[in-house]
Amino acid sequence: MSIPLLVIVSGPPASGKTTLARQLAHELNLPLITKDDIKESLFDSLGWQDRAWSKKLGAATYHLLYYFLEAALAGGVSLIVESNFGPMSTSELKRLQEIYPFRPFQVMCRADGKT
């Protein structure tokens, strides 16, 4: 089995991450996991309440994102993952790479604020 490729698309909000990730997934014919798609699905299923609820769903979103990511990597599947990953994400991605070796390729999106 070859070592899977993990394309990590990251950057601040409104920097074009999702647009780029969707285009890459289409062009490379790779599955795509996006944080916002997971969170929207949770909101659609569980509803909206207040800021505290949103934070709980945000934590659950990352838990599910890493769960899906781990399942794909365990199966040797190359894929794209998109989120505004923070510093805490590095340790989780390193942990996954130790268990399920993958070839990382990170794309960091930025915008000048005028877009």
Feature roles, as predicted:
Residues 1-4, 73:
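Phosphate-binding P-loop
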Residues 19-74:
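Conserved substrate/cofactor phosphate-moiety recognition/catalytic segment
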